[in-house]
Amino acid sequence: MQTMYQTMNDAELAAAIDDLEARVAEVKARELKLDMARGKPSPEQVAISRPMLDLLSADSDLTDGGVDCSNYGCFEGIPSARALAGEFLGVDPSQTLVLGSSSLLIEHDSVAMCWLKGTCGHAPWSEFSAAHDGARVKFLCPAPGYDRHFGITEDLGIENVPVRMTENGPDMDEVERLVAADEGIKGIWCVPKYSNPTGDTYSDETVRRLTSMKT
């Protein structure tokens, strides 16, 4: 999926650079001091969780389900945290993993491991192109979606393929058509509950079709 600038010739790129530099200079001249970070909760929202800072002390019992949480803990995450996640997600705690606080880091590591090592005994994704006459590995990207998800696959050289996002999740007719016809498609970026940025939640039918479709 080419960007707008990748489709431009040299003259068009030069003109675009001049235009952007002029616009940047105009904004800088205003001497604004803006926080452009995205997704930051308001101070009021952060304040809701502040009482948690007072729950533990050096004398607190840090054992949870037989796990010493002051030490390395366990791979799946501490039991009470998994139970809480299961409650939020509406699933049994045994179906949850509680890892680091950054979902983006977990997603990056998962895709990078597939790229380097493959899945379930299959060849690494990085070897796909050489074995298929130069065809690229692809990832479906429901749009609008989270650009930093798309940046992970793009950074690895994976081709992002946009799929229309609906209020019930990705357009499953299009998803099923694409994956049935192209073995280079290895995955799809999904935020099934409160999708970023639309806030939509995937319908039960969308989830069923995602988990049962032929690839």
Language-model region placement:
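Conserved core of the PLP fold type I
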Residues: 61, 67-215
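N-terminal "arm"/small-domain region of PLP-dependent enzymes with the aminotransferase-like
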Residues: 2-76, 80, 86-87
